[in-house]
Amino acid sequence: MAKKVKGARVTIHLECIDCNNQQDSGRKLASFSRYTTQKNRYNTPTRLELKKFCPSCSKHTIHIE
């Protein structure tokens, strides 16, 4: 039997940090922004941070993995 090799690409979910902070402070939001993307685990072993548009905040914010 052949070995099952994990690929270099993994699917990740990016969430808005501003929406998460507002939910933690007690402010109720209707929803928060979540993007789905892929990353290469060998090129970027650390957590990914991208600046994306958040529709619930209506501005560009940092989204973290």
From Swiss-Prot:
- GO annotation (BP), single: translation
Q: Which UniProt keywords apply?
A: Chloroplast, Plastid, Ribonucleoprotein, Ribosomal protein
State the signal peptide span: none
Q: Which cysteines are joined by disulfide bonds?
A: none
Name the InterPro entries for this protein.
Ribosomal_bL33, Ribosomal_bL33_CS, Ribosomal_bL33_sf, Ribosomal_zn-bd
List the record's Gene Ontology CC terms alphabetically.
chloroplast; ribonucleoprotein complex; ribosome
- Give the coiled coil ranges: none
**Which domain of life does the protein's organism represent?**
Eukaryota
Location comes to: Plastid, Chloroplast
Molecular-function annotations in GO:
structural constituent of ribosome
Which Pfam families does the record cross-reference, listed alphabetically? Ribosomal_L33
Task: Indicate whether Plastid appears among the record's keywords.
Answer: yes
TM region positions: none
Q: Family assignment? A: Belongs to the bacterial ribosomal protein bL33 family.
| HAMAP family listed in its UniProt record | Ribosomal_bL33
Q: What is this protein called?
A: Large ribosomal subunit protein bL33c
